[in-house]
């Protein structure tokens, strides 16, 4: 773990800031009652008003009625399950697919132990966490977009289809 520097209480600048009440809360205002009684209810009521306003102005229409005799060609899950659906769809062994899905949170749990930094540092000074985030986001987007395509184009996203067609024609 990183070594944290203890504050020098003999420093006159620090003592002046602490005397003004700038130690724990930088602005010097207590959270009670200002924030909890006045600001939070306004934010909560504003959020509820925005939700009600959107529900009134843009109501969510119910789709066409279900027809049990006409099923779609491919059933897709909700958009936030697309990467998981793509993993299960492309991996031939279902147990391996489930193990891949379990390995994602297990791998993310190991990231804090790989870096020995202070938790308040800049993300650019934490290269492992930044790299894991960027690669994970790219892979999740790749899998999510691929889940909406047919199975033969899902891994390449249809980007290499022209080259494959040209090789078949030769």
UniProtKB/Swiss-Prot annotation:
Gene3D superfamilies referenced in this protein's UniProt entry, alphabetically: plastocyanin oxidoreductase (1.10.287.980), Single helix bin (1.20.5.510)
CDD domains per UniProt: cytochrome_b_C
Record keyword Transport present: yes
Superkingdom assignment: Eukaryota
Gene that encodes it: petD
InterPro entries xref list: Cyt_b/b6_C, Cyt_b/b6_C_sf, Cyt_b6/f_cplx_suIV, Cytochrome_b_C_euk/bac
Protein name: Cytochrome b6-f complex subunit 4
Organism: Nymphaea alba
Database matches in Pfam families: Cytochrom_B_C (PF00032)
Description of how the protein assembles with itself and partners: The 4 large subunits of the cytochrome b6-f complex are cytochrome b6, subunit IV (17 kDa polypeptide, petD), cytochrome f and the Rieske protein, while the 4 small subunits are petG, petL, petM and petN. The complex functions as a dimer.
SUPFAM superfamilies, alphabetized: a domain/subunit of cytochrome bc1 complex (Ubiquinol-cytochrome c reductase)
